[in-house]
Amino acid sequence: MLAYPRIDPVAVSIGPLQFRWYGLMYLFGFISGWWLGRRRAAQPGSGWHPQQVDDMVTWAIFGVVLGGRLGYILFYDLAYYASQPAAIFQIWHGGMSFHGGLLGVLFAVWLYARRAEREFLSVVDFVAPLIPPGLFFGRIGNFINGELWGAPTTLPWAMVFPDGGPFPRHPSQLYEAVLEGVVLFAAVWWFSGRKRPVGAVSGLFGVLYAIFRFAVEFVREPDPQLGYLAFGWLTMGQVLCLPLFGVGMWLLLRNRGAAEGPAAR
């Protein structure tokens, strides 16, 4: 068994101000996505300018924060937030949903594409490879917060989390950081480096994320207010991954054999 590091959730305190690791991880994710976007935009034939990346990332940030928070409230704990509306704004304590954040980003990208007169799916293809680093940092934030731990296990790398009871558990946050952050980034970044049919990069992102998240949910403790939804193992996270997988497969297969569009557009 490994010792849980017990990192103070507060990274820096300046008088009454507290800067928490969870919030800083989101900041690191936004910065990494912005930097990667500018790097991709600088490549010949990308069809993007750095200023356009700045504008698009700004729209996406609002989509992530608003969509992620609203998604968590609606999908995971509506009853609690209906009774404690002030808690809606306490984002630093956690409570963000990837699927809600994804919907928020898609809506923000749609608004940006409409304003910039760009094809929606082409913009999503450009954005998709920029997302996994943010997922990596977000899961590290979950780990530092000691939340979203895994199910009990006897594996040698199990950890006892501060609020997870006396049982050693899967560090499922780290599993997700590796799969959804590192592996997903490597696959989608490589795939998007060549010309692909419009929507194919977005499709690969959706399919791989759904597979990785669905798999990790088997060793992740479900949210206590929801538990398992069916069959003694099906979680809300897995349910939300099903349409993502379906849409991703459709995007991958719909233009199979079609002419490839501009890379990273």
Swiss-Prot record:
Carries keyword Cell membrane? Answer: yes
Molecular function, one GO term? phosphatidylglycerol-prolipoprotein diacylglyceryl transferase activity
**Enzyme class, spelled out:** transferase
Question: Under which pathway is this protein filed?
Answer: Protein modification; lipoprotein biosynthesis (diacylglyceryl transfer)
Quote the subcellular location field of this record. Answer: Cell inner membrane
For this UniProt record, the keywords arranged alphabetically read as follows: Cell inner membrane, Cell membrane, Membrane, Transferase, Transmembrane, Transmembrane helix
Known InterPro entries for this protein?
A: Lgt
GO terms (BP aspect): lipoprotein biosynthetic process
Q: What is its EC number?
A: 2.5.1.145
GO cellular component terms given for this protein = plasma membrane
Do you know which PROSITE patterns this protein is assigned to?
A: LGT
TM segment ranges: 11-31, 56-76, 91-111, 120-140, 173-193, 198-218, 233-253
Per the record, the similarity remark reads:
Belongs to the Lgt family.
The name this protein goes by in its record: Phosphatidylglycerol--prolipoprotein diacylglyceryl transferase
Q: Which organism is it from?
A: Nitratidesulfovibrio vulgaris (strain DSM 19637 / Miyazaki F) (Desulfovibrio vulgaris)
Quick one: which gene encodes this? lgt
